[in-house]
Amino acid sequence: MVIELATITVIEGQEAAFEAAFATAQRYIAESPHSLSYALTRCIEHPSRYVLRFEWDTLKGHTDAFRGSAAFQEYRALLYPLYAAPPEVVHYNHVSLPAAG
């Protein structure tokens, strides 16, 4: 499993429009066979900033399969016009740690 964190800054004053657009666009993520889960969070200190956390089955499931799909083009068309700048997107792996105590 791969965790993707996308930091998104939307155009100031467009937060409600972005959240409404994401409510529509999330179906494209949910329908992807490579998507395991996702969550949209909004920054308290900077209300125009969001972090979108995804869990994908593999990195290629995200970067090749989802981003290369027609569904991604629809997703992008709904959300990207509301971005103040391109999102910062990074991928992570879980780190296995021994149990505490």
Task: Report each predicted region and the residues it spans.
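Glycine-rich beta-strand-turn "strand-cap" elements at beta-sheet edges
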Residues: 2, 39-51, 76-101
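Active-site-flanking beta-strand signature of metal-NTP-handling nucleotidyl enzymes
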Residues: 3-8
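Short hydrophobic/aromatic beta-strand micro-patches
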Residues: 9, 41, 53-55
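Short, surface-exposed ligand-recognition loops at beta-strand->loop->(often short) alpha-helix junctions
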Residues: 10-18
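Short loop/turn positions at the edges of beta-strands in beta-sheet-rich folds
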Residues: 12, 44-46, 56
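An amphipathic, aromatic/His-enriched active-site/gating alpha helix that lines ligand/cofactor pockets
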Residues: 24-36, 55-90
